[in-house]
Design a protein with these regions (language model features):
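Amphipathic, heptad-repeat alpha-helical segments
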Residues: 77-99
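Extracellular/lumenal glycan-associated context and N-glycosylation machinery
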Residues: 69, 73-77
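C-terminal amphipathic alpha-helix
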Residues: 2-67, 97-154
Length: 154
């Protein structure tokens, strides 16, 4: 059961992480394009009004996050987070032979939560947002792969 829960953790974090990654990339693109007045067929509906770029990137981000599709994505990410939280609760206090697995799972969980948080509620400057996004995105893949290597076959 413990190995099955670990495998479920890996599956859910990579699935949710992939959705969060797409949302973070779009957020970063909207943010950047507003500041640097870059036209783009994907972001123009958020970055411009009446053919003119918004003076404040927060206006653009507010338009992005007010969109129905974004609300659906955010809702899905929050549901994913609740599911992963439950899996992590099941994995606490591992048997001794799974201690290293649990450490990797905990690191995977931290990266996953960081990525979800950035996707759901962007904050900071474009620079810090981009740096945090890169770190969590890289860490998610690193610990996903590490956990795979540590999981013994059932």
């Amino acid at each position: 059961a413990y190995i099955a829960s670990r495998n479920e953790l890996r599956a859910q974090t990579i699935r949710g992480g992939s959705v969060a990654e797409k949302m973070c990339n779009l957020t970063k693109q909207v943010w950047y394009n507003t500041i640097y007045e870059e036209r783009d067929s994907i972001t123009d509906k958020y970055t411009r009004s009446g053919g003119v770029f918004h003076d404040d990137f927060n206006t653009s981000l507010s338009l992005l996050y007010a969109e129905d599709n974004t609300a659906t994505v955010i809702s899905g990410l929050q549901a994913s987070r609740e599911l992963v939280d439950g899996i992590m609760a099941d994995l606490q206090n591992p048997p001794a032979e799974f201690a290293a697995c649990y450490e990797a799972a905990d690191s995977l969980y931290d990266a996953y939560c960081g990525l979800i948080d950035l996707a759901v509620s962007p904050s900071g400057s474009l620079k810090t947002y981009s740096e945090n996004f890169s770190k969590y995105d890289e860490d998610l893949l690193k610990y996903y792969n590490k956990l795979e290597a540590l999981i013994p076959s059932e």
